[in-house]
Amino acid sequence: EWCEVKVYQPWSAPLLHINLSESQIKDLLQITDTISKDTNRVSYNDKLAGEIENEWEIPTSNDMTPQTLKFHSFKNYIDGLVWKYLKTLASQYHIENDEIPEPLVIFKNNIENIKIISAWFNDQKDDEYNPAHDHTGVLSGVLYLKIPEYLPSRKHHNADGSIVFISNECKTDGIMTNSTLLLSPEVGDLFLFSSSLKHQVYPFRTADEKGIRRSLS
């Protein structure tokens, strides 16, 4: 019989992955569709690294519009995810009596007052991409609302349209550790991660070159 096994890994922040419900996806599609059709929508191109034409701001103000109300409702869900993230992060430390380790105290104290600094969505088309980059702030997230059918990759590994997370740690051995994680997202996937974690998005191809992949960050 095994004794209790504990695992510690305080030298890296985790990547949280969860699937949204159909109702959440529907609400977020309604928000982004409305913005897409708004002639007064605000471009986010000059604030982002992506080689993507259609990048639009999602207002995070307290204006009582149907879109902002729905988005604020979704923010309550994000608040809960951040708590899950903190618990996972704390579990990587050596913890006695459920005490939060000192490096995370400030994080914990601010969780009840989470502020979304900025929000936007991308409508990515054929051959558009996001180069390796990171974000400001403490935590970042990306979720997927639309994904077209891609043409088969020209190579055997089928990485077209993938998102790649890149470790900030320079030294990896390729056996027990790896410097990158490549994921092929599906509709409803949400990833939450440290804003300092670099990531990039590969381009894709569709049969009619009119496919749109919508992601929200």
Language-model features, listed with the residues they occupy:
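Catalytic core of non-heme Fe(II) oxygenases with the double-stranded beta-helix
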Residues: 113-192, 200-202, 208-212, 216
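Non-heme Fe(II)/2-oxoglutarate
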Residues: 1-108, 127-130
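Short amphipathic alpha-helical "recognition" segments used for binding
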Residues: 79, 206-207
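Sparse recognition of residues in long alpha-helices and their boundaries
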Residues: 94, 203-204
